[in-house]
Amino acid sequence: MYKDDSLTLHMDLYQINMMQVYFNQGIHNKKAVFEVYFRQLPFKNGFAVFAGLEHIVNYLENLTFSETDIAYLKDLGYPKDFLDYLANLKLELTINSALEGDLVFANEPIFQDRKSVV
């Protein structure tokens, strides 16, 4: 573990690449809606029970790119202006979500956030 290990980079680098595209195109502050859903239910059930909202909210409220995160992305070749932007990123978003214990179904949004593209 690194001294400032964060969960921020526990994602596919595709997400970072798309953030860079939005940044390069100058649309990173444009408002957008993102939805989270799942395609298939486990165990061939007809529904699932939603749980973990507190963890999601806590993650989003504390999402920052640590010095180690930025150093790693620098080693991958991301440009300085983009890395500076990520180092200072502060999320401002609105969350709409299923409630703890709600029944949720495949291919239907269970979580939605409204924020800038990046």
Predicted regions and their residues:
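Ordered alpha/beta subdomains of enzyme catalytic regions
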Residues: 1-118
